[in-house]
C-alpha cells in the first residue's frame, strides 16, 4: 500500500491511499473517532484512578506534612521569639537595677570619700595650726633674741662709728639711750 519514492536528497516514506491520494491522519479518521474517544476515556479514567489512589494521597500527605512542619516551625519560632522578648525585658530590668545599684554605690562612696576628705582636711588644718603656732612662737623668740642682739650690735656699731669719726670713745650710757630711742621709733 505504501510506496517509497526517492528524490535527490534521499529516500522518504509516506502513506498514500490506492488511487494516488493521501490518507487522512489516523486520529482524525471518521471511522475510528468513536473508538478513540472510548479509548481516551478509559485511559483517562484509569490514569485518574491510579493517580487519585496512589500518587495524589502521597502528594497530599507530603503537602500536609510540609504544612504541619511549617506550622510547628512557626509556632516554635514564635515561642522562641516570646522567650527572647521576655529574656530581653528581664535583662533590661536587671540592667536598670544594676545601674541604680551602681549609682547608689557611687553616691555612697562619693559621700564617704567627701566625709573622709573633709575630716582629713580638718585634721590637717589642726596640725598646720599647731605647726603655725609653734612657728610663730619660734619666730617671736628668734625675733626677740635677734632684737636683743641687734641692740647690742647697734650699740657697738654706734660706738665704733662715733669713735672713728671723732677719734674719742663715747659714753656707753649715752650710746645705749640713743640706740633705745632709735629702736622705739
UniProtKB/Swiss-Prot annotation:
Q: How is the quaternary structure described?
A: F-type ATPases have 2 components, F(1) - the catalytic core - and F(0) - the membrane proton channel. F(1) has five subunits: alpha(3), beta(3), gamma(1), delta(1), epsilon(1). F(0) has three main subunits: a(1), b(2) and c(10-14). The alpha and beta chains form an alternating ring which encloses part of the gamma chain. F(1) is attached to F(0) by a central stalk formed by the gamma and epsilon chains, while a peripheral stalk is formed by the delta and b chains.
UniProt topology in membrane: Single-pass membrane protein
Q: What does this protein do?
A: F(1)F(0) ATP synthase produces ATP from ADP in the presence of a proton or sodium gradient. F-type ATPases consist of two structural domains, F(1) containing the extramembraneous catalytic core and F(0) containing the membrane proton channel, linked together by a central stalk and a peripheral stalk. During catalysis, ATP synthesis in the catalytic domain of F(1) is coupled via a rotary mechanism of the central stalk subunits to proton translocation.
Name of encoding gene? atpF2
Keywords from the UniProt entry: ATP synthesis, Cell inner membrane, Cell membrane, CF(0), Hydrogen ion transport, Ion transport, Membrane, Transmembrane, Transmembrane helix, Transport
Membrane-traversing stretches: 34-56
Stretch list, region Disordered: 1-25
Q: Which GO terms describe its cellular component?
A: plasma membrane; proton-transporting ATP synthase complex
Please report the organism this UniProt entry assigns to the protein.
Answer: Nitrobacter winogradskyi (strain ATCC 25391 / DSM 10237 / CIP 104748 / NCIMB 11846 / Nb-255)
Q: Which CDD domains match?
A: ATP-synt_Fo_b
GO MF annotations, alphabetized: proton-transporting ATP synthase activity, rotational mechanism; proton-transporting ATPase activity, rotational mechanism
Please verify whether the record's keywords include Cell inner membrane.
yes
**Record localization:** Cell inner membrane
HAMAP family, alphabetized: ATP_synth_b_bprime (MF_01398)
Q: What is the official name of this protein in its record?
A: ATP synthase subunit b 2
The UniProt entry's sequence similarity note says: Belongs to the ATPase B chain family.
- InterPro entries, sorted: ATP_synth_b/b'su_bac/chlpt (IPR002146), ATP_synthase_B_chain (IPR050059)
